Amino acid sequence: QRQMCIRDRYIDHVIAAAPCKLNGLKVVMDCSNGANSVIAPVILRSLGVEVVTIFNQPNGININNGCGSTHLEALQAKVVEVGADVGIANDGDADRCLVVDEKGEALDGDQMMLICALELMKKKQLKDNVLVTTVMSNVGLHQAMKKYGGSCVKTAVGDRYVLEEMLKNGYSLGGEQSGHIIFGKYANTGDGLLTAIKLSLIHISEPTRP
């Protein structure tokens, strides 16, 4: 019963981060045979998403085995095969997320962070217009943030250092190129499903946005 309570609280928490439904969106979800194998499709479907799942049969051994955010090939092929709007890949413990567009082309964490940062800036919800990144982030991310009136603060590699900087200065958003993205309003760690939902919300509001 306690496990159910924790699960239900998490479901409610993630759904609450979506101010509207995602009706009409078709998503391929690569669960990496990991922690999100059961719960991610449930949450996405409750938001109105048509979900096609792959690698959602964990057996304790096959986690991250040729699938998930470090092996996007199967996801890319499936997105094109079924005509999905987007493909989502978590890693085994579901704190990372990478995304594939409708053409099967992958977005890395830097591109995803920029999309999220610009959306928060538009809504005046990005503290000081600052995105917290690591020294591994591409210089193009910094240039793009500057172009749109924002800036990046760099930390050492590791989401723990990103979080430390966010907590120290109250920043709203931070992450790594690998797909660890932290939304300070909702969590103090990366959450692959939360990231996927936030990106999906942006997609349905601006479907032509890169």
Where are these regions (language model features)?
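Short hydrophobic/aromatic-enriched beta-strand-loop microsegments
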Residues: G48-F55, A106-Q111, G149-V157
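Gly/Ser/Thr-enriched, mixed-charge loops and adjacent short helices
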Residues: Q1-Q3, R7-V82
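Phosphate-binding and adjacent anionic-ligand microenvironments
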Residues: V86, K123-L201, S205
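Short, glycine/acidic-enriched loop or turn micro-motifs at the edges of active sites
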Residues: N33, G92-R96, G104, G179, ...
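Residue-level detector of conserved catalytic or cofactor/ligand-binding positions
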Residues: Q1-R2, I6-D8, S200-P210
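Conserved active-site and cofactor/substrate-binding residues in soluble primary-metabolism enzymes
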Residues: R9, A35-I39, C67-T70, A74, ...
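Alpha-helix capping and helix-loop boundary segments enriched in small/acidic/polar residues
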Residues: C31, N62-C67, G104-D108, V132, ...
